[in-house]
Amino acid sequence: MSKKNFLFTSESVSEGHPDKVADRISDAVVDAFLGADPYARVAVETLVTTNLIVMAGEVRGPASVNAALMDELARHAVKDIGYEQDGFHWKNAEIINRVHSQSADIAQGVDAAGDKDEGAGDQGIMFGYACNETPVLMPAPIYYSHEILKSLAEARHSGAAPQLLPDSKSQVTLEYRDGKPVRATSVVVSHQHVDGLSQADIKEIVRPHVKNVLPEGWMPAEDQFYVNPTGRFVIGGPDGDTGLTGRKIIVDTYGGAAPHGGGAFSGKDPTKVDRSAAYAARYLAKNVVASGLADKCVIQLSYAIGVSKPLSVYVDTSGTCKVDEDKLAVVLQQLVDLSPRGIRTHLGLNKPIYARTAAYGHFGRSPDADGGFSWEKTDLVEQLKKAF
């Protein structure tokens, strides 16, 4: 997004979107394993469709996290999201579990042995991004898309909007002038609802949530404010569309405002650099912007399976850097050990902190007291300032 004047659009989906239901179940399993053993290995994929949940993947961890417990975790996740519909109900959905032991070939590449440092769990590239468009240093379109759906979900869970059901999507288009967002030119919200309500009814339920989230004066013209454009959205969730873990990687990150390496997050323990290195890249980029060294920052990391150190570290501030970018890349690597183990140790990732990340974005969230969203901390700011 280097042009000065343009329109840019991002979307979000709610916790009840089929793909997010799958993400939530997969991350509930990750949390169960890490809660029982901080060094457990987990790679679990979930498929959800009409009254069916399928889990498959590879794990290495305590026997206490067995098929019965995983089934219970899946039902609890679906119940917490709010699905009690004929076509998808937490109580009576069929569950097929095909989770099995991790490959010994993968384990030997990842495990530390003797004087050999623990290697990355796979090859790959990961990106992190931050910009000063919002207080949480996230791009504005994805930030407001998330906030609209979070507000609606809170109203649904609290009982303030009982007409709403779990599945929903949002899309926000912002106008940028001189590189800064100035207003919303269009907003789209599609929200599942109980039968018997008109499109106009849902629009009036949704309207105050959009208006309260957007800055004053940013509400789009009425003919550019779309709510349930098809007119009806009663059948939804996994009963309407099949969901899979890892299919909302742009929603999970920066809404298309920054590159993506292609690896999904949910269902993976933090030895998987798809997840942990993407968190580290966000952490570094956010601290660069929070320190005032740049207005925006993209960081790319790359890894090879079984190799502990990153193969490359790339920093790009789109010409906004107030210091030398090459030196910045060196300093960042001095401040944080970017080996898989170094990242997990620095950010405290071997904890059951992942189910909460499964909806409304992995980034732009507030760090939790128990270590959740640790990659959103800005505790490198003073060290970065001193380095320059």
Swiss-Prot record:
Residue sites binding K(+) per the record: 45
Residues that bind Mg(2+): 19
Binding residue positions for ATP: 17, 167-169, 232-233, 241, 247-248, 264, 268
Record-linked PROSITE patterns: ADOMET_SYNTHASE_1 (PS00376), ADOMET_SYNTHASE_2 (PS00377)
Cited SUPFAM superfamilies: S-adenosylmethionine synthetase
Pathway membership, UniProt: Amino-acid biosynthesis; S-adenosyl-L-methionine biosynthesis; S-adenosyl-L-methionine from L-methionine: step 1/1
EC numbers for this chain: 2.5.1.6
Compartments, record wording: Cytoplasm
Any GO CC annotation of this UniProt entry: cytoplasm
Catalyzed reactions per annotation: L-methionine + ATP + H2O = S-adenosyl-L-methionine + phosphate + diphosphate
One Pfam assignment: S-AdoMet_synt_N
GO MF annotation: an example: magnesium ion binding
Cofactor comment: Binds 2 divalent ions per subunit.
BP-aspect Gene Ontology terms: one-carbon metabolic process; S-adenosylmethionine biosynthetic process
InterPro entries from the UniProt entry: ADOMET_SYNTHASE_CS (IPR022631), S-AdoMet_synt_C (IPR022630), S-AdoMet_synt_central (IPR022629), S-AdoMet_synt_N (IPR022628), S-AdoMet_synthetase (IPR002133), S-AdoMet_synthetase_sfam (IPR022636)
Region (Flexible loop): 102-112
Keyword entries, A-Z: ATP-binding, Cytoplasm, Magnesium, Metal-binding, Nucleotide-binding, One-carbon metabolism, Potassium, Transferase
Domain of life of the source: Bacteria
Positions with a binding annotation for L-methionine: 58, 102, 241, 272
Known cofactor(s): Mg(2+); K(+)
Entry-linked NCBIfam families: metK
Described purpose of this protein according to its UniProt entry: Catalyzes the formation of S-adenosylmethionine (AdoMet) from methionine and ATP. The overall synthetic reaction is composed of two sequential steps, AdoMet formation and the subsequent tripolyphosphate hydrolysis which occurs prior to release of AdoMet from the enzyme.
The family this protein is said to belong to: Belongs to the AdoMet synthase family.
Quaternary data: Homotetramer; dimer of dimers.
PANTHER family xref list: S-ADENOSYLMETHIONINE SYNTHETASE
Name used for this protein in its record: S-adenosylmethionine synthase
Species in which this protein is naturally found: Paramagnetospirillum magneticum (strain ATCC 700264 / AMB-1)
